[in-house]
Design a protein with these regions (language model features):
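Gram-negative/organellar outer-membrane beta-barrel architecture
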Residues: 58-67, 73-212, 368, 376-390
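Outer-membrane beta-barrel "beta-signal"
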Residues: 217-220, 357-363, 379-390
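Transmembrane beta-strand segments of outer-membrane beta-barrel domains in Gram-negative
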Residues: 26-55, 64, 134-138, 145-267, ...
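Bacterial Sec-dependent N-terminal signal peptides
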Residues: 1-32
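Repeated loop/turn-to-beta-strand initiation elements of outer-membrane beta-barrel proteins
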Residues: 93-95, 129-133, 180-184, 227-229, ...
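Membrane-embedded beta-strand positions of outer-membrane beta-barrel proteins
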Residues: 68-70, 86, 104-108, 133-137, ...
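C-terminal outer-membrane beta-barrel translocator/porin domains of Gram-negative envelope proteins
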Residues: 216-221, 225-324
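Transmembrane beta-strand segments that form the barrel wall of outer-membrane beta-barrel proteins
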Residues: 55, 65-74, 99-112, 118, ...
């Protein structure tokens, strides 16, 4: 079974071979080309095998340990597509091995439905961990579906409209170390959402199709995780307060409070239990593009992201992660979530479940390629990505 999985994964991986290695010279006669065919084939597959065999080895001699992987995928939302992800690990202070390395991930995707995506995420840890900088930038174009705002709107499968969603976001964050594992700082966030080709524009209830949102925020966090992209132990807690005032050019003035708690515990050999409780709460005149969204590849997996949306969101998930053989692993998770207009109108009966299973392949040292299949209430979805969901 493991061999079959390995073969299947190898078939979908993209390997970029230097051009001069394949050509083996600027000019080649037909005879010389025939004579070197077997050599080139053997060289290609040897390099292919060695690339992925060595990709998860720690390379301390490299200033920037960078690798790339990609392949086809399928999901109920985006259909058949081709995704590419790249991961890099580095240390700003290469002599200090006591702190977690910095990491950066670049990702791109294109599918047969017309969806395309390009993004970058990263965490930079400065010498002695005095400062941390986080970056999250992306752009995508997606033929989307919109049910409206509120639980009742989302639960009606047929009450929806189609439109094309173009979204771009830049979020920069800088944190200062106040005490061991305790950080505080500020961020800036810009997001633009443009909705085009609505089948039924009445779903927006007169709201603007193009929404720009810009604002600063304050952050305080406690982080004892041993490795940010894939923790094996530790605790993470963060409180974030974002402001989007009208005087900064926002059409709608509102505020957002986000809380995030995560705990990681080693169990038996190769086993980790991870849990997360997360909430997002909006106050003021929140535009339709900035209300809290349920679903996607990081939480409440199985649900179409944004089918259920409202001012406020609370969600919880617990995931069991087990390494089974060499670089291969499996996961299983369960959880629940709820969207609601405000705390006074929270209803337990509107809580939705999520559960699923996943496969992990260690692409780089403690950096996993993630294949998940999630289930919700009458829905399911497949996800391909890099790094753990949380």
């Amino acid at each position: 079974m493991i061999q079959r999985i390995t073969r299947a994964l190898s078939l979908c991986l993209l390997l970029f071979i230097p051009f001069h290695d394949i050509m083996a010279g600027e000019f080649m006669t037909r005879d010389s080309l025939n004579n070197t065919t077997d050599t080139l084939k053997n060289g290609f597959f040897h390099r292919f095998y060695r690339y992925f065999e060595q990709s998860n080895k720690v390379k301390e001699e490299k200033k920037f340990d960078f690798s790339i992987i990609g392949g086809p995928h399928f999901s109920s939302d985006t259909k058949l597509g081709l995704g590419v992800v790249a991961s890099g690990l580095f240390r700003i202070d290469r002599e200090d091995k006591t702190i977690s390395p910095s990491n950066i991930s670049l990702y791109g995707d294109v599918t047969t439905t017309g969806f395309y995506l390009l993004g970058i995420r990263g965490n930079m840890i400065f010498p002695k961990d005095r400062f941390r900088a986080n970056i999250n930038m992306y752009f995508f174009s997606f033929p989307s579906e919109y049910w409206g705002i509120g639980y009742d709107a989302g639960k009606d499968e047929d009450h929806k409209t189609e439109y094309k969603r173009l979204e771009q976001q830049v979020k920069l964050e800088l944190l200062y170390k106040l005490a061991p594992n305790l950080y505080a700082g500020a961020n800036l966030m810009f997001r633009n959402v443009t909705a085009r080709n609505f089948d039924d524009i009445t779903f927006l209830n007169g709201a603007k199709k193009n929404v720009n949102t810009f604002g600063p925020g304050l952050v305080i966090s406690y982080d004892s995780r041993d490795f940010i992209p894939n923790p094996a132990r530790g605790f993470f807690a963060q409180l974030e307060q974002q402001f989007f005032p009208g005087w900064l050019g926002n059409d709608d003035s509102f505020k957002r409070t986000s809380v995030d708690f995560r705990y990681y515990q080693k169990m038996w050999k190769g086993a980790i239990l991870a849990s997360q409780l997360q909430g997002t709460f909006n106050y003021g005149d929140t535009p339709w593009s900035m209300v809290s969204l349920m679903g996607g590849s990081y939480a409440m997996r199985g649900y179409y992201e944004g089918r259920y949306r409202d001012n406020d969101l609370i969600q919880f998930q617990v995931e069991y992660r087990q390494k089974i053989y060499n670089r291969h692993g499996i996961t299983a998770w369960g959880g629940a979530g709820n969207v609601f207009p405000d705390m006074d109108k929270f209803k337990w009966k509107q809580t939705l479940p999520t559960y699923g299973i996943g496969y992990r392949w260690e692409f780089k040292n403690r950096v996993n390629v993630r294949l998940d299949y999630g289930f919700g209430k009458g829905v399911s979805a497949f996800y391909f990505g890099i790094n753990e969901a949380f």
